[in-house]
Amino acid sequence: MILQKIKNKFFSWLESHDRKRVIMDRVDNEPYLERYYIFLKDRTWFPFNVFVHKFLKSDPDDVHDHPWPYATLILKGGYYEWIPQFNNYGEKIGEIAKWRAPGHFRICSSTSYHRIELDPNVTAWTLFMPGPQKREWGFLVKNKWIPNGDYLESRKQHST
């Protein structure tokens, strides 16, 4: 009970100090995740940052990479992480789903692909620590990397 009160006060403080951002799904314009800036809100030169994420919606069906290497720790709840499998020629041949439960810790490069699928009965909270930006991010579609903006614009056009 005391820990719950501390957590509530902490997140209320972050929100009251403009350290909460709701990231919208850019296709359906629905809330995708809540990001709480634990460290720097506007990082430009510092080599890493620390966020708490509360996932509100699953990722799109295609796997994506990230602009930075990152580490993530599941704090509460969990999710299915779909990870692509590749053949010896670098072609995607399938995906496997792994349940990521509280306590799961993972370090990934900026070129690691995955997608998150939520269990509708579980709220996923993670500690997310991105490193320095290495590249733009995008999605893997039919064994081809598609830049984030192009991918989302294509999805938006196909959803209308």
Task: Name every feature range the model reports, one short phrase each.
Residues 66-81:
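Short, conserved beta-strand element in jelly-roll/cupin
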Residues 136-160:
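Active-site or metal-binding loop neighborhoods of secreted/extracellular toxin and effector enzymes
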Residues 44-45, 70, 82, 100, ...:
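Beta-sandwich/jelly-roll carbohydrate-recognition scaffolds of carbohydrate-active enzymes
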Residues 84-115:
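Short acidic-glycine-tyrosine-enriched beta hairpin
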Residues 107, 115, 121-138:
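A short hydrophobic beta-strand segment most commonly corresponding to one strand
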Residues 51-66, 110:
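Conserved short histidine dyad/triad with adjacent acidic residue
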Residues 60-66, 98, 117-119:
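Short histidine-centered beta-strand/loop micro-motifs
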Residues 1-47:
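A short, N-terminal "cap"/entry segment at the start of jelly-roll beta-barrel domains
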